Amino acid sequence: MNPALGNQTDVAGLFLANSSEALERAVRCCTQASVVTDDGFAEGGPDERSLYIMRVVQIAVMCVLSLTVVFGIFFLGCNLLIKSEGMINFLVKDRRPSKEVEAVVVGPY
């Protein structure tokens, strides 16, 4: 029997098994806590300070992106408003008063 093929079936059996022990072994094998360095000491995950710095950087980036979107929408709306006012003024200039404006009869109420 080919040893590589047997290893593949063991891995498939590990993932297809319904027991909690097999799932626990799979999770334990793939976490950062299980990494061992060359000198035999286990290397832990990222420390608390670097996690805090990463979180602050993520918040700052999200704030900058949010402000960019808000101001982009605001200035786009202002630009469209200015253009629409210009188009209205253009239409108003082309309109001429009717000759019938002077012929309005005002009666008693």
Curated annotation (Swiss-Prot):
Record's note on what induces expression: By p53/TP53, following X-ray irradiation.
Membrane topology, as annotated: Single-pass membrane protein
Transmembrane segments: 56-76
Any one annotated GO CC term: cytoplasm
Phosphoserine: residues carrying this PTM: 98
Protein keywords: Cytoplasm, Glycoprotein, Membrane, Phosphoprotein, Transmembrane, Transmembrane helix
Subcellular localization: Cytoplasm; Membrane
PANTHER family: PROTEIN REPRIMO, PROTEIN REPRIMO-RELATED
A GO biological process held by the record: regulation of cell cycle
Keyword Transmembrane listed: yes
UniProt entry tagged with the keyword Phosphoprotein: yes
Further information: 'Reprimo' signifies stop/repress.
Family, per entry: Belongs to the reprimo family.
Record protein name field: Protein reprimo
Function of the protein: May be involved in the regulation of p53-dependent G2 arrest of the cell cycle. Seems to induce cell cycle arrest by inhibiting CDK1 activity and nuclear translocation of the CDC2 cyclin B1 complex.
Glycosylation sites per record: 7, 18
